[in-house]
């Protein structure tokens, strides 16, 4: 349908003409907000076509399974340009009997059909409510380059009357933050090697290992209960300070040595490979260790539409943990020694850096600053501030229990 020269109010009246049921709730996304959501959700659209949408007074959650694992994308109510809600939560399937889906509105396209506005209208009474989704976009008209035609598409769905759903609301015991370059290393690792994924954390390092012996390692600076970071082995090689700092990850929680093995590698691999980070986005790897029989690893992407995913795991036995840790530490130390410059050159580099940055003699220690001691030399290098670790900001959407069950 084409609509020419319509004001917002006139357009709204015409869009909802024919749906005479009284409106009980409403949600609106305009172009500026919608553009950010499309850039965040579009890479996952093909995985989300059969997803479930949950509306409540706290906003919208998009929930789907990814290779048998659970994935959640919360969009809080304050992100909508208009959001009015009354009544209990409403659950609808995104898929329709045809080729359309409620998720199509979040797909990025190269043609002008990318939506500029998105409306959700809710009618009826539970458990027989309906949702009317209206997607509005513009296309070039036939009267010249300045002629723009407003088009719209509507999808109508009924709510699910019976459903069971899980919303994890645990607080992670340990949360590790990865920047974009560090997350790219994880993607390359999972793309190159196959079938199993193992996480090992010590007091100073985090190792991620896959089948075939491939692994990546990071130096960990952990913020415990808001205190200063615990000491870590910052300097493995001083030939390139930028490379050293790129190997440092920051996190929070109660650190202890442990290892977990994911029960399904394919789900974690698919989630990581389908996510792309911008320079302003970060990824948090969360570890849930309170349940000793069923630990979980969580993946949280901090963006306009944050992505939460959870993967069941099992603890490594003390014997396996020791064997894996010994082999990876040995290989990491061999690489460190190979890259280390001669001692005389190393001292010259340290002296120049110390004089330039601090104006103190070698070995000077500035008070009230986060400093870390190098290997075998009395030199201190300043570390970046700790980035507070993310938590499940919208994990309490299920306030009654972890499992929601409504029966008609």
From Swiss-Prot:
GO terms for biological process: DNA replication. A motif (Nuclear localization signal) lies at residues 344-353. GO terms for molecular function: DNA binding. The keyword DNA-binding applies. GO terms for cellular component: host cell nucleus. It is found in: Host nucleus. It comes from the Viruses. Keywords: DNA replication, DNA-binding, Host nucleus. InterPro entries: DNA_clamp_sf, Herpes_UL42. Coiled coil: none annotated. Interacts with the DNA polymerase catalytic subunit. Interacts with the origin-binding protein. Belongs to the herpesviridae DNA polymerase processivity factor family. Plays an essential role in viral DNA replication by acting as the polymerase accessory subunit. Associates with the viral polymerase to increase its processivity and forms high-affinity direct interactions with DNA. Facilitates the origin-binding protein loading onto DNA thus increasing its ability to assemble into a functional complex capable of unwinding duplex DNA. This is DNA polymerase processivity factor. It comes from Varicella-zoster virus (strain Dumas).
